[in-house]
UniProtKB/Swiss-Prot annotation:
Taxon lineage: Bacteria, Pseudomonadati, Bacteroidota, Bacteroidia, Bacteroidales
Enzyme class, spelled out: lyase
Name of the gene encoding the protein in the UniProt record: pyrF
HAMAP family xrefs: OMPdecase_type2 (MF_01215)
Source organism (scientific name): Bacteroides thetaiotaomicron (strain ATCC 29148 / DSM 2079 / JCM 5827 / CCUG 10774 / NCTC 10582 / VPI-5482 / E50)
Keywords carried by this UniProt record: Decarboxylase, Lyase, Pyrimidine biosynthesis
Official protein name in the record: Orotidine 5'-phosphate decarboxylase
């Protein structure tokens, strides 16, 4: 999926919502535990209930890998289900990979060749040769960690060099030498607020994947005020605030209502550019 197709989906659905599939076997409704594959059964119900309200899904690999082979099978089935039934959805593998070149090449092969996923989150700490293997696949995206929403982001990402440049700013500037805004996005946490204004001075045209709205306390209005550009430029993720709002047999209906509430807010924000 290219940048224009992504923007067309945003305009059509009046939404830039990404539903995070952070599926924890300990948190799904109890009645699903009797299913042959409880994780996939949960994901399928959430996807069917929200697909017309969002433009992306983001399975977090840690939740699947923690269950071993069963978890990976559920992940593969989830990706396949989205691709076959909702082909307009942008799929993000939230894997946060990034290693020496030949290792990154294997990670890239997993997500882009074997699973044919649209994008993968990548950690930039090891530099260019850890990222470029992901960029050899035409039509696929790298979503580079830039400024995250966790408290620990202050430990490294906000530290300044002798010239006053913060580490996340250096990541943004340097990585533009590796790919343009048709191949690369950045993770910027919703809790970072006014930092979006500084980020847009460096990467005015790139899409930003924004976690942290909802359960983590980020403000959608503030993110849009400082982060939205002429093609929206935002994919805002919500996980717990949608998928875990109800643990009864009506969990999917409740998830839909939660997603709908966010979509309505997004439609209002999009009026500024549409």
């Amino acid at each position: 999926m290219n940048k224009q197709q992504l923007f067309e989906n945003i305009k059509r659905k009046k939404s830039f919502l990404c539903v995070g599939l952070d599926t924890d076997i300990k948190k799904i409704p109890e009645h699903l535990l009797k299913e042959e594959d409880p994780i996939f059964a949960f994901n399928k119900a959430i996807i069917d209930a929200t697909a017309d309200l969002c433009i992306a899904y983001k399975p977090n690999l840690a939740f699947y890998e923690s269950m071993g082979v069963k978890g990976w099978i559920a992940f593969e089935k989830t990706v396949k289900y989205i691709k076959e039934n909702y082909p307009d959805q942008f799929i993000i593998a939230d894997a946060k990979r990034g290693d020496i070149g030949n290792t990154s090449a294997m990670y890239a092969r997993t997500f882009f060749e074997e699973l044919e996923i649209d994008s993968v989150t990548v950690a930039p700490y090891m530099g260019e040769d850890s990222v470029t293997p992901f960029l050899t696949y035409e039509g696929k995206w790298v979503i580079l960690l830039a400024l995250t929403s966790n408290k620990g982001s202050h430990d490294f990402q906000l530290t300044e060099d002798a010239n006053g440049e913060r580490l996340f700013e250096k990541v943004l500037r340097k990585s533009q030498e590796w790919a343009n805004d048709e191949r690369m996005m950045y993770v910027v946490g919703a809790t970072q607020g006014r930092a979006f204004e500084d980020i847009r001075k460096i990467v005015p045209n790139h899409f930003l994947l924004v976690p942290g709205v909802g359960a983590q306390g980020g403000s959608l209005e503030e993110v849009c005020k400082y982060g939205m550009n002429s093609t929206c430029g935002l994919i805002v993720n919500s996980s717990r605030g949608i998928i875990y709002v109800d643990k009864t047999e009506k969990f999917a209906e409740a998830a839909r209502l939660a997603a709908q509430e966010v979509q309505v807010q997004m439609a209002e924000q999009l009026k500024a550019i549409l």
